[in-house]
Amino acid sequence: MKILLANKFYYRRGGDCIYMLNLEKLLKAHGHEVAVFAMDYPENLDTPWKKYFPKNMSKLMAFTRPFGSHEVKSTFKKLLDDFKPDVMHLNNVHTQLSPVMAELAHQRGIKVVWTLHDYKLLCPRYDCLKNGNTICETCFNGDKKACLDNKCMKGSKLASFIGYKEAVVWNRERLEVC
C-alpha cells in the first residue's frame, strides 16, 4: 500500500514527530511504500521527499498558512500527482501546513486518517487552558469567540484573531466529510 504521512516537522522535535517517524519505520518494515510531507526545516531528516516540502515562511506570510497557502497547496498537489497514495495519514498539521491537505486528498478519492495529538479542533489554543493554567471548555460548543475575548493565543489580540479564524474555517462540519 502507498501511504503518505504528513506532519509539520520531520525531525525528533516532540511526541507527534517521534510518533510519525516511528510509524514511518514500522510501515516500511511491513512492506508499505511511504512518502512524507512536512515543512522545510534545516533540522529535518534527509528524505527523497524533501523537494516537495514548503519553505519556511516570513511572519507576514504566516497569516495565510493556517488557511492553506498557495505554496502548501501547490507542493502538496505535486506530491499527490507523483506519489499517488492510497491513504494519507495526517498528524500535527495545523498552522504551518493546514487541514487543506485533507480536502485535497479527499477530492482525489484518497482515504484520510488523522491522528489528533492535541485539542486544536476543540480549542484554538491547542490545550484547553485559559491563560495557560485554568481548564477551559468554553469553545467546545463550537463558538470559538472566547479565544478573542481571552486573548488565548500568546496573550495577543492578533494571534488570537488568527487562531479564531483558523478554528472557524477548519470546523468539524467541513472536515468530517474528508
Regions found by a protein language model. Name each.
Residues 100-108:
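Catalytic-core regions built around general acid/base machinery
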Residues 25-87, 128, 143-150:
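A conserved catalytic-core segment of Leloir-type glycosyltransferases
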Residues 17-18, 45-50, 101, 124-129, ...:
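Short aromatic-enriched loop/helix-cap "lid" or pocket-rim segments at secondary-structure transitions
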Residues 107, 120, 135-178:
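Membrane-proximal helix-turn-helix segments that form the acceptor-binding/catalytic region
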Residues 1-42, 81-83, 107-111:
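N-terminal subdomain of nucleotide-sugar transferases
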Residues 20, 96-99:
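Short, well-ordered alpha-helical microsegments
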Residues 77-97, 110-115:
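Short N-terminal targeting/anchoring amphipathic segment
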Residues 116-126:
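A short, histidine- and acid-enriched strand-loop-helix "catalytic/donor-clamping" loop
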